[in-house]
Amino acid sequence: MLNSAMSVVILAAGKGTRMYSDIPKVLHTLAGKPMVQHVIDAATKLGAAQVHLVYGHGGELLKQTLKDDKLNWVLQAEQLGTGHAMQQAAPFFSDDEDILMLYGDVPLISVETLQRLRDAKPQGGIGLLTVKLDDPSGYGRITRENGKVTGIVEHKDATDEQRQIQEINTGILIANGADLKRWLSKLTNNNAQGEYYITDIIALAYQEGREIAAVHPARISETDGVNNRLQLSRLERIYQAEQAEKLLLSGVMLRDPARFDLRGTLHCGMDVEIDANVIIEGYVTLGHRVKIGAGCIIKNSVIGDDCEISPYSVVEDAHLEAACTIGPFARLRPGAELLAGAHVGNFVEMKKARLGKGSKAGHLTYLGDAEIGDNVNIGAGTITCNYDGANKFKTVIDDDVFVGSDTQLVAPVTVGKGATIAAGTTVTRNVADNELVLSRVPQVHKQGWQRPVKKK
């Protein structure tokens, strides 16, 4: 069916006392992203013309964290219930648009479920998302007559008979803007909590003869809210299990789906293999036949075809061309770039550095602010000394250079094509093509030397 224009209200004013945190509840993260951001993203994908965020506690921190100038920030200075929160947003509703109500602490709600709810909304009525629970204790119950929804009664206000009802309110609903404003104006706080319940509009709509269409989500977990860290951790595992399942069904080999975390967006080629305890953050692309070893963290990086990242390596804001090998225990920091066939071994760190085709840095090396050509060998213990205490400087190493172990390159410095740097050398001046450079303290031999004896 053809949908009306729609705006979304996200309720995010609660303090989250049971989180025992100074951070507003909705800013606690799920899959590396604030809970409320998941909800904002769903609203955006659904095509919301405007997203109204009702906030209260920690408003400044919310604004600083979300940094979204498209949001309409609506202050709820006193938290007097969900109906009161919607009343604060009501002046921004257009009469001819639909208003979808969501919650900042219900992060797993899917676009597909919301679209079905939107499609099911009757003309002049309400679309209401409900679920059936084996144990509905604590939730508002859906009351019906002859199968039709007539209202919602909160648990504290329910009779013993009503508490036997298993269908409960999720709090998510959609209604026309003009209708919603009229119903909101009629709300009272005559209940056990002394609050203004948005749920009371269901009875008001029924009294006007309006239809209330109940829709169920694809999964009950979509409507699970978060009140404490235990609930958040459970939703995290549900989310991660869903992401792992999608990857497995798309052809990615996860060696242990229960020990894989996706905290962003992952694009994979064919025959990708990911071992246990791998974390993917931000936007990551893995080419064909990429292998990621156990315990690796990959963040905002592009990994080319046939690359292999050995266990316990960290790759952040890096770009690897085809057939590169990394680790184990390697660290690629922002700006690291490896051309085809390059190798970075154990305990090697790169930052703002390019390693050319077929070049190798096998062990115990720091390469920072460096441009390294093709077919270069970087010996163990090599350091680019890029910082003088105030400024950073660049090291340039041309093609076919051999750098011996325990070399220090004091930037700014350039090493010419085909040069050889002997082990233990400190390079402080530019090196010409094909030169041999060495700087060593003369070796001293003392015959018959005796080690000191400890005094008694």
Swiss-Prot record:
GO terms for molecular function: glucosamine-1-phosphate N-acetyltransferase activity; magnesium ion binding; UDP-N-acetylglucosamine diphosphorylase activity. Pathway: Nucleotide-sugar biosynthesis; UDP-N-acetyl-alpha-D-glucosamine biosynthesis; N-acetyl-alpha-D-glucosamine 1-phosphate from alpha-D-glucosamine 6-phosphate (route II): step 2/2; Nucleotide-sugar biosynthesis; UDP-N-acetyl-alpha-D-glucosamine biosynthesis; UDP-N-acetyl-alpha-D-glucosamine from N-acetyl-alpha-D-glucosamine 1-phosphate: step 1/1; Bacterial outer membrane biogenesis; LPS lipid A biosynthesis. It comes from Salmonella paratyphi A (strain AKU_12601). GO terms for cellular component: cytoplasm; membrane. Residues 1-229 are annotated as: Pyrophosphorylase. It is an enzyme of class 2 (transferase). The gene is glmU. It catalyses: alpha-D-glucosamine 1-phosphate + acetyl-CoA = N-acetyl-alpha-D-glucosamine 1-phosphate + CoA + H(+); N-acetyl-alpha-D-glucosamine 1-phosphate + UTP + H(+) = UDP-N-acetyl-alpha-D-glucosamine + diphosphate. Residues 230-250 are annotated as: Linker. UDP-N-acetyl-alpha-D-glucosamine binds at residues 11-14, 25, 76, 81-82, 103-105, 140, 154, 169, 227, 333, 351, 366, 377. Binds 1 Mg(2+) ion per subunit. Disulfide bonds: none annotated. Gene3D superfamilies: Hexapeptide repeat proteins, Spore Coat Polysaccharide Biosynthesis Protein SpsA, Chain A. This is Bifunctional protein GlmU. Residues 251-456 are annotated as: N-acetyltransferase. In the N-terminal section; belongs to the N-acetylglucosamine-1-phosphate uridyltransferase family. In the C-terminal section; belongs to the transferase hexapeptide repeat family. Keywords: Acyltransferase, Cell shape, Cell wall biogenesis/degradation, Cytoplasm, Magnesium, Metal-binding, Multifunctional enzyme, Nucleotidyltransferase, Peptidoglycan synthesis, Repeat, Transferase. It is found in: Cytoplasm. GO terms for biological process: cell morphogenesis; cell wall organization; lipid A biosynthetic process; peptidoglycan biosynthetic process; regulation of cell shape; UDP-N-acetylglucosamine biosynthetic process. HAMAP family: GlmU. Its EC number is 2.7.7.23, 2.3.1.157. Acetyl-CoA binds at residues 380, 386-387, 405, 423, 440. It comes from the Bacteria. Catalyzes the last two sequential reactions in the de novo biosynthetic pathway for UDP-N-acetylglucosamine (UDP-GlcNAc). The C-terminal domain catalyzes the transfer of acetyl group from acetyl coenzyme A to glucosamine-1-phosphate (GlcN-1-P) to produce N-acetylglucosamine-1-phosphate (GlcNAc-1-P), which is converted into UDP-GlcNAc by the transfer of uridine 5-monophosphate (from uridine 5-triphosphate), a reaction catalyzed by the N-terminal domain.
